[in-house]
Amino acid sequence: MSLIKSSVFMFSMLTIAVSANAKGPKVSYDHAGITAIDHKNEAQVKWVSAESIQKELKGKPPITVSFDIDDTVLVSSQCFYYGKQTFSPDSLDYLHNQAYWDFVADGCDNYSIPKESAKKLIDMHQARGDQVIFITGRTPHRLHKAGQMDQLARILERAFHIKNMKPINYTHDKPIAPYKYDKTRFMVENRVSIHYGDSNDDILAAREAGIRGIRVIRSATSTNRPLPLNGGYGEEVVEDSSY
């Protein structure tokens, strides 16, 4: 077995065995790729940038683009690290604990760090007149009402200077039939053309929705492990997007 095929195989096994929170069907990688700490196959990745995407879209009418939140636009591992240590030190049960999500919704993201790469992408899209929305697997506060502009929405609006900010689309990490992935429904309902995300399910949901899914690199300091294989499905990857 070649080194590249061996690497893809090993990452596939890790993805299937360890990805505990995402609910969509697991799909093995079929391409070589990179992580934030391993770039040996970077020559085989389909790299894109805010500039290259802007050129591709030149002359086309405005579109709707969606962004995942955690590890895509915000460095928010501190919220998850604290949550695990506080609510379930020995498991991932905290992710299913409403008290934890209430803690996050009550302002934890005031301490999250906006990613520079996300700012560049969002600035580019807004300069074109595109509508930016956010889709997250998080669970909102127990008192949250669908369609409500909550604290997270205001934090993102300020951090990225979002025009015509829309309420956050919360999936509760639960796919809704007939879709297999939790974010697909929101991509379809909002007529999204491009989705940016760091997880495998971001890319697979975009494919299920029949739209363009572009990978953002998860930071090496993220507590969300294992790090995904960026480009592992042959998808485009945003260069220098780990920060």
Swiss-Prot record:
An example Gene Ontology CC term for this record: outer membrane-bounded periplasmic space
SUPFAM superfamilies named in the record: HAD-like (SSF56784)
Keywords, in A-Z order: Hydrolase, Magnesium, Metal-binding, Periplasm, Signal
Binding-site positions, Mg(2+): 68, 70, 198
GO MF assignments: acid phosphatase activity; metal ion binding
Keyword match Signal: yes
Signal peptide stretch: 1-22
Domain of life the protein comes from: Bacteria
Binding site for substrate: 136-137, 183
Chemical reaction(s) catalysed: a phosphate monoester + H2O = an alcohol + phosphate
Protein EC: 3.1.3.2
Cofactor: Mg(2+)
Localization: Periplasm
Positions annotated as active site in the UniProt record: 68 (nucleophile), 70 (proton donor)
Bound cofactor: record note: Binds 1 Mg(2+) ion per subunit.
InterPro entries: Acid_phosphat_B-like, HAD-like_sf, HAD-SF_ppase_IIIB_AphA, HAD_sf
Subunit structure: Homotetramer.
Function: Dephosphorylates several organic phosphate monoesters. Also has a phosphotransferase activity catalyzing the transfer of low-energy phosphate groups from organic phosphate monoesters to free hydroxyl groups of various organic compounds.
UniProt similarity note: Belongs to the class B bacterial acid phosphatase family.
Name the record gives this protein: Class B acid phosphatase
The gene coding this protein: aphA
